[in-house]
Amino acid sequence: MPLNEQRSAIEQVAFIQKLPKQAIEKDLWVTSIIQLCFDLPCADSLVFKGGTSLSKAWGLISRFSEDIDLGIDRKVFEYEGDLTKRQIKKLRKASSLFVRDELYSQLGKAIEESPLNGFCQVVPQPDGVGDDTYPEPRRILIRYKSIFEDTLGYLSPTVVIEAGARSLLEPYKEVQIGSLIESTLPTIVATVADVVVKTSLAEKTFLEKAFLLHELFSTANGREAQRRSRHIYDLYMMMQKGIHHSAIRDDELWESIQHHRSILTSVQGVDYSTDVRDRICLVPPEEFVSSWLKDYDDMAGAMIYGERPNFEKLIDGMRVLEDLFHNHKNG
């Protein structure tokens, strides 16, 4: 498609969706990279997860997708079941090197053989120093050439893949992923790889986001929002679709998530020994609120299309959700 036609299509979708044109362009890049990832030789070992899956796969939130979270099957590195601290350290290194070398190499080759070739640069996250020599999860940055001259502060022309092997992969389902351009203007075909994408179930993502907020708000780790307010928005929007009803009472799924986090991604200061649902904390402490409010306002203007509930409404929703968790045995 000629450049002027690309601009015209993106601007048309931006008008319809009430989103910045740069957001529509980035969604197209995010979608294309997801499709390419699940057409790679290593695709069978990957699972698409996180907040982006809620919009791209399940249509549960009206939040523009910014990054791509991928879980890597630990079996690739010959690790299964519960691991010792020593094994986890080895797994983190193996996973980090896999992303830096293998995933980066395969993705770079796929881009070279796709219509995206010549329009972006693929850069792996560099090694760190000391204990952070091998970051895990590790990032791959895809820096693309925007067809628009003006930029937005909250949106950069970069797609971020974050991949690691410490994630809980199941349950998942295979789905197809499309762009906002294709769903808004069905006559336009923008698919770069016709693939199915193994994607975490929404109920699992719901519970993981709730657990993450508890880990942030029950410790000092949530003092600065740092682009995390989207988790509150995501939970609130999923509540409007009724996801919480089945998720909160799914004892088997919750227990698998809590057990997994206690071993592989535990946060210092968080008690994993008893059912966290009984005391889960989903509302930021008063001293955290200003940071989270500012982060949400910044994010909402650039990344939310459709309903944009105010921050107070989100917090009210989290209070309701807290009570539902605390009373899960009575449901």
Please report, for each region that a protein language model flagged, where it lies by residue.
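Structured mid-to-C-terminal alpha-helical surface segments
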Residues: M1-L46, K56-S62, I68, R74-G331
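Glycine-rich beta-strand-to-loop/alpha-helix junction loops that act as flexible
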Residues: F48-T52
